[in-house]
Amino acid sequence: MTAKAQHYDVIRKPIITEKATLASENGAVVFEVAIDSNKPQIKEAVEALFGVKVKAVNTTITKGKTKRFRGTPGKRKDVKKAYVTLEEGNTIDVSTGL
């Protein structure tokens, strides 16, 4: 597997919500990442894929809700989010392609 493919395994997709938009005003971008990825892997992937310098990475894991499907209880998957703060002067435009 190439290095670029490994970076795409770490970063799944950008998260575009009201909270993520407010964070982008402070120079942060929010991504959904692989549940087993760590902060150095996320930093390396963002720097390699987008060509920017990363200042800090904060992560959070949201536990999946229990829902019912046709009467039987099921569970949604856990989601890990990464709040990536960029160095001054660096930007990532995640809204292109929408």
Curated annotation (Swiss-Prot):
| Any one GO biological process | translation
Q: Which family does it belong to?
A: Belongs to the universal ribosomal protein uL23 family.
Q: What is this protein called?
A: Large ribosomal subunit protein uL23
Q: Which InterPro entries match?
A: Nucleotide-bd_a/b_plait_sf, Ribosomal_uL23-like, Ribosomal_uL23/eL15/eS24_sf
Q: Name one GO cellular component term.
A: ribosome
- One Pfam annotation reads Ribosomal_L23
Instruction: Report the source organism.
Output: Dinoroseobacter shibae (strain DSM 16493 / NCIMB 14021 / DFL 12)
Q: Which gene encodes it?
A: rplW
Q: Which HAMAP family match?
A: Ribosomal_uL23_B
